[in-house]
């Protein structure tokens, strides 16, 4: 606190653990002569009162790092003496007030990390004295205002992580005092702006994750003070200008995830470089041994570098300071002694060798531990990795060096040819958090080599697609896991009762489990996904799971579940599949009334659009019957919804409450014995894409409102007792005639257009032998036409899954981690 003539003019309460609301009764509002007010890094909440705009003498106002919410009051535009305004890292919403353009003395305006929307006000261009403008991490849209041309004194401009569009304005080239420019994670387009080369004071330039195209200019060396250059995840083409890599001050360089090509002469790169990320481009040729000159590298990413031959991994042995090394998918076949290779490094934390054809020399790490020299002491310490990815390398043995890796957190050796038993010592690694052993040929688990009371801190384990036999491993089920995936094995017996109560995802589908679902599942309050498909479970419908408020996916298909299904409450259920069981009885008319997320999801569509279920570590996957085909969704969009009750023994009418599920995408009720009319309420399913009610005993008309469902691309009404004209909507006219066959009472112009029968009825299907043979040939041709694109699609999806890193790996192993150390320099 600072006073002048009995008046408090300066009040600094930053980092004082204060909380609560700032209301009109707060003593602060009696200090009308304040010039400096800093309440940053506290726990204040609620809205800012407009009366704060009455502090007419304020020159500095800092409310950053609190929990303030609501809109930024326009009255702040009355603080005409203000030179610094910092509202960073709060929960402010709404538009940026145009009145802030009145603050003509402002030099710092920091509004980042809020929830602000709308366009950037044109009036901010009036702030001609601004040196620092930060609007990052909001939801701002539109183009950069032309009025920004007046902000010629800017030294720092951060517009990153918004939804801004258009090209970078040419007047940016006149910001000759600019030191840092960040526009990453927007939707900017166009070529690299040549006029940016005039910014000779520029130290940090981040263009990442936009839609920039074209080539990089050859004379990048004019940015002679450049330290950080991030332009990853764009569509830049051509070669990397050698002048850019030669800038002496350059420390961090990221051009990964573009379409660059050509060769790279590593010997000409600035020796001060600490981070070099070039992965996921179109580079071809050998990795030259001159890379060994980059002795100051901490991070190196050359993933998807098409070497077209073997690699001598010893060329990396001089890079002793490396912390993160990414060498995945190099299109190489080589032999590597992991012990010898790893002993070259002092501080290696992350190693990614996935997607290569590696023959690993697998020495025992107990008798030959991986060690690294400690200069000046003549001693050696074991090298301890935290993250190791050997996925898809064709290795046949479990890597023995892992036995001594006491700091290992993330381990992925999936998609290999490793057989035998999972070693018991694996579970003794104290920091192990993520283990992926899927897609190998493991047969079992060695005896746990720890006391029964010992609990690892593991969050994720996948042993899917192996040859595990016997019971579900009780000791793994008891781990404090968030995700346990053991699908597609040969596991048998009953569920253990001691399943982790921290689970979010449990997938044991495609095994031979018997008995009933354990009632202990009801204690897993965080469970989001339960998949037990294709087992031999014999039980009634688990109504008791309705107490799990977070349950979003329930897959019981292809078991021996039986009995009726009564009205129950599943408020967050998005996907349910109970097909291929023995459920029977009628479904009450109000059966779906408490499945609220399927008729409220659209209200939060912007929140979930593009998001997938799972976490940064893993993605949930399921098989759904969609549009007449079984499709494997390797990642589940949060906005996807599906109800599949097919191939059971349900009877009676289809519940009218089905019409409440306005956000439903897939509905399959086929192969039951439903009777009565198709509910007209189905016409309210505005998001429906696939509808299958075939092979029931439905009667009456097809509701005409179904013709108005614009997303309905697939439908099957065949093998019922339906009558009357087909709806006239465009979607109906594009269906195959087989979608309506075996319904004797259909007629009308829509049916004639669909089936092109011109007067024939659906019963007149018999034809002479030659015509029948001809139709059979045509059917085979049609099947082949459908089959070939299916193969192409499958190969394409396989390529994508094999060649691109899973989301969890990019989040945990990827460049974001390495960037965090340098971003503080901005």
Swiss-Prot record:
It is a single-pass type I membrane protein. It holds the Pfam family LRR_14. GO terms for biological process: defense response to bacterium; innate immune response-activating signaling pathway. GO terms for cellular component: plasma membrane. LRR repeats lie at residues 5-31, 32-54, 55-79, 81-103, 104-127, 128-150, 151-177, 178-198, 199-223, 225-247, 248-271, 273-294, 296-318, 319-343, 345-368, 382-405, 406-429, 430-452, 455-478, 479-500, 501-524, 525-550, 552-570, 571-594, 637-661, 662-685, 686-709, 711-734. Gene3D superfamilies: Ribonuclease Inhibitor (3.80.10.10). The chain crosses the membrane at residues 781-801. Disruption phenotype: Enhanced susceptibility to pathogen Pseudomonas syringae pv. phaseolicola. It is found in: Cell membrane. The keyword Nucleus does not apply. Keywords: Cell membrane, Glycoprotein, Leucine-rich repeat, Membrane, Plant defense, Repeat, Transmembrane, Transmembrane helix. Glycans are attached at residues 12, 54, 102, 126, 150, 198, 201, 219, 268, 312, 331, 362, 389, 436, 439, 467, 498, 538, 584, 594, 668, 716, 736. Its main location: membrane. PANTHER family: OS10G0469600 PROTEIN. Belongs to the RLP family. This is Receptor-like protein 18. It comes from Arabidopsis thaliana (Mouse-ear cress). The gene is RLP18.
């Amino acid at each position: 606190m600072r006073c002048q003539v009995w008046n408090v003019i300066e009040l600094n309460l930053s980092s004082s653990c204060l909380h609560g609301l700032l209301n009109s009764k707060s003593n602060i509002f009696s200090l009308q002569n304040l010039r400096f007010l800093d309440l940053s890094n506290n726990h204040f909440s609620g809205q800012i009162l407009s009366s704060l705009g009455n502090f007419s003498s304020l020159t500095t106002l800092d409310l950053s790092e609190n929990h303030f919410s609501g809109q930024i009051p326009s009255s702040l535009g009355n603080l005409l003496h203000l030179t610094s305004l910092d509202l960073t890292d709060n929960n402010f919403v709404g538009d940026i007030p145009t009145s802030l353009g009145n603050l003509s003395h402002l030099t710092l305006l920091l509004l980042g990390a809020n929830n602000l929307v709308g366009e950037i006000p044109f009036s901010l261009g009036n702030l001609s004295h601004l040196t620092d403008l930060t609007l990052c991490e909001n939801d701002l849209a539109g183009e950069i205002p032309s009025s920004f041309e007046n902000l010629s004194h800017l030294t720092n401009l951060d517009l990153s992580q918004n939804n801004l569009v258009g090209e970078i304005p040419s007047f940016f080239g006149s910001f000759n005092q600019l030191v840092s420019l960040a526009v990453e994670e927007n939707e900017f387009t166009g070529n690299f702006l040549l006029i940016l080369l005039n910014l000779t004071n520029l130290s940090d330039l981040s263009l990442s994750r936009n839609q920039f195209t074209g080539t990089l200019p050859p004379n990048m060396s004019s940015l002679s003070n450049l330290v950080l250059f991030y332009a990853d995840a764009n569509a830049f083409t051509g070669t990397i200008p050698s002048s850019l890599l030669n800038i002496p001050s350059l420390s961090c360089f990221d051009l990964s995830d573009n379409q660059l090509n050509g060769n790279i002469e590593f010997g000409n790169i600035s020796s001060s470089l600490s981070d070099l990320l070039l992965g996921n481009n179109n580079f071809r040729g050998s990795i030259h041994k001159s890379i060994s000159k980059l002795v100051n590298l901490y991070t190196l990413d050359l993933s998807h570098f098409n070497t077209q031959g073997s690699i001598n991994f010893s060329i990396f042995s001089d890079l002793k300071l490396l912390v993160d090394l990414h060498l995945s998918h190099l299109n190489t076949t080589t032999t590597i002694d992991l012990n010898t290779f790893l002993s070259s490094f002092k501080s290696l934390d992350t190693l990614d060798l996935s997607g290569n054809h590696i023959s690993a020399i697998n020495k025992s790490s107990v008798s030959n531990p991986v060690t690294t020299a400690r200069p000046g002491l003549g001693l050696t310490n074991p090298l301890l990795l935290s993250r190791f990815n050997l996925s898809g390398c064709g290795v046949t043995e479990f890597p023995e060096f892992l036995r001594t890796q006491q700091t290992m957190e993330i381990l992925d050796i999936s998609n290999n040819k490793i057989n035998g038993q999972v070693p018991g010592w694996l579970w003794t690694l104290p920091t192990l958090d993520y283990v992926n052993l899927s897609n190998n040929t493991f047969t079992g688990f060695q005896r746990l080599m720890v006391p029964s009371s010992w609990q690892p801190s593991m969050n994720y384990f996948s042993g899917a697609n192996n040859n595990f036999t016997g019971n579900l491993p009780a000791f793994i089920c008891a781990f404090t896991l968030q995700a346990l995936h053991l699908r597609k094995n040969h596991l048998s017996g009953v569920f253990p009762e001691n399943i982790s109560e921290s689970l979010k995802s449990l997938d044991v589908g495609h095994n031979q489990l018997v008995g009933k679902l354990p009632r202990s599942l009801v204690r897993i309050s965080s469970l989001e996904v339960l998949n037990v498909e294709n087992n031999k479970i014999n039980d009634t419908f688990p109504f008791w799971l309705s107490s799990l408020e977070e349950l979003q996916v329930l897959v019981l298909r292809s078991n021996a579940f039986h009995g009726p299904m009564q009205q129950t409450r599943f408020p967050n259920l998005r996907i349910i599949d109970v097909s291929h069981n023995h459920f029977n009885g009628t479904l009450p008319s109000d059966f779906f009334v408490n499945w609220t997320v399927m008729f409220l999801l659209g209200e939060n569509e912007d929140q979930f659009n593009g998001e997938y279920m799972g976490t940064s570590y893993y993605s949930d996957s399921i098989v759904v019957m969609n549009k007449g085909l079984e499709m494997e969704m390797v990642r589940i969009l949060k906005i996807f919804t599906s109800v599949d009750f097919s191939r059971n023994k349900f009877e009676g009418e289809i519940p009218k409450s089905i019409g409440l599920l306005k956000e439903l995408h897939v509905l399959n009720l086929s192969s039951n014995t439903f009777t009565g009319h198709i509910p007209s309420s189905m016409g309210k399913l505005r998001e429906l894409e696939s509808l299958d009610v075939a092979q029931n005993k439905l009667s009456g008309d097809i509701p005409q409102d179904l013709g108005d469902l614009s997303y309905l691309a697939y439908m099957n009404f065949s093998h019922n007792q339906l009558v009357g004209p087909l709806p006239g909507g465009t979607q109906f006219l594009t269906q195959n005639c087989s979608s309506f066959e075996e319904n004797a009472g259909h007629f009308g112009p829509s049916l004639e257009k669909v089936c092109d029968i011109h007067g024939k009825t659906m019963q007149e299907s018999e034809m002479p032998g030659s015509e029948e043979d001809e139709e059979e040939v045509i059917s085979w041709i049609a099947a082949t036409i459908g089959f070939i694109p299916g193969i192409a699609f499958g190969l394409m999806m396989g390529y994508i899954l094999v060649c691109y890193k899973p989301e969890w790996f990019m989040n945990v192993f990827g460049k974001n981690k390495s960037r965090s150390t340098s971003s503080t320099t901005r």
